[in-house]
């Protein structure tokens, strides 16, 4: 049975960039929800505690294969839109930590 893959992206978002950033995240997640293998997502905003990252997004994919397929579709879509995520993050002054995770038994 394939193991779920979790895409977890953590961001330090300046207050001045918050609305534009969250609007972009919502649009991206709406597109991700249409992709085969999408299981669930969360967009989380820190409200207390000493953590560095104030916005965290997660997407659970059914398998490594569905994650890779969705990544290819998203990359192609960005190319069509002439959208460069790294340039947007730099322009908005956002620090990002992007990674894929698998679940461990507790």
Region locations from a protein language model:
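Residues within well-ordered alpha-helical secondary structure of globular protein domains
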Residues: 24-27, 73
């Amino acid at each position: 049975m394939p193991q779920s893959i979790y895409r977890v992206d953590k961001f330090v978002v300046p207050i001045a960039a918050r609305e534009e950033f969250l609007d972009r995240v919502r649009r991206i997640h709406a597109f991700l929800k249409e992709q085969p293998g999408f299981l669930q997502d969360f967009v989380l905003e820190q409200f207390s505690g000493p953590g560095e990252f104030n916005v965290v997004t997660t997407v659970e994919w059914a398998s490594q294969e569905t994650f890779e397929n969705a990544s290819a579709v998203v990359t192609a879509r960005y190319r069509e839109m002439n959208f460069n995520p790294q340039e947007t993050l730099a322009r908005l002054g956002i620090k990002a930590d992007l990674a894929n995770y698998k679940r461990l038994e507790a």
